[in-house]
Amino acid sequence: MCGIKQEMSGESSGSPCSSASAERQHQTVWTAPPKRPAGRTKFRETRHPVFRGVRRRGNAGRWVCEVRVPGRRGCRLWLGTFDTAEGAARAHDAAMLAINAGGGGGGGACCLNFADSAWLLAVPRSYRTLADVRHAVAEAVEDFFRRRLADDALSATSSSSTTPSTPRTDDDEESAATDGDESSSPASDLAFELDVLSDMGWDLYYASLAQGMLMEPPSAALGDDGDAILADVPLWSY
């Protein structure tokens, strides 16, 4: 069990970690040497492959965070259980920034999981006990994810408002209805003809054609215009 860590600072315990720690160039897990593989061979590896201070807990997909307190051999600070690996990784960063700012880490740069944690996480610059650090870390991580959700909701609202749908006018609806009527008229005429033929019956149709072929041609006594020719006029009169 870690003892009480007394830290005195001119800043109030609630002020965020600003210029002193934010201006330092902190290392990250992407620039620091890779993590050494676990020495345990008989147990399943639960540590996160990239993030520091993060390991899996059980089969429910939850993650826990626990950090080593710099300068205090064998002392670890438990930070809690989180739903995502990023939440546990952010808690690690907040704890390291708070301990470093208070002088527990020697005042130098610490290794973070995310480089932007140095200015996105509001952590105290001084603390009296490690319990204060744990409480400040929980508030910093909760505030970080609350601001992220608010930003995502704002961006989604702005993107939906910048692309309004074009309203349909009455002229567009009338032209669309007219085009539909014109395009459907040839098809309706063809359907009408097919319906007439089907109602007559193909047998009756061909029978009427045969009957017309058996009819005698009109009499030659009628002219082309239907008037009767009164006398036969010879073609040659000599």
Curated annotation (Swiss-Prot):
Secretion signal, residue range per the UniProt entry: none
Bias type Acidic residues, positions: 170-182
Region described as Disordered: 1-41, 155-188
Short name of any one Pfam family annotated for the protein: AP2
Induction profile: By high-salt and cold stress.
Biased composition (Low complexity): 9-22, 155-167
DNA-binding region per Swiss-Prot/TrEMBL record: 50-115
Gene Ontology molecular function, alphabetical: DNA binding; DNA-binding transcription factor activity
Cellular component aspect of the GO annotation: nucleus
Cell membrane found in the keyword field: no
Cellular location(s): Nucleus
UniProt keyword annotations, A-Z: Activator, DNA-binding, Nucleus, Stress response, Transcription, Transcription regulation
Function recorded in the entry: Transcriptional activator that binds specifically to the DNA sequence 5'-[AG]CCGAC-3'. Binding to the C-repeat/DRE element mediates high salinity- and dehydration-inducible transcription. Confers resistance to high salt, cold and drought stress.
Similarity annotation: Belongs to the AP2/ERF transcription factor family. ERF subfamily.
The name this protein goes by in its record: Dehydration-responsive element-binding protein 1A
Recorded name of the encoding gene: DREB1A
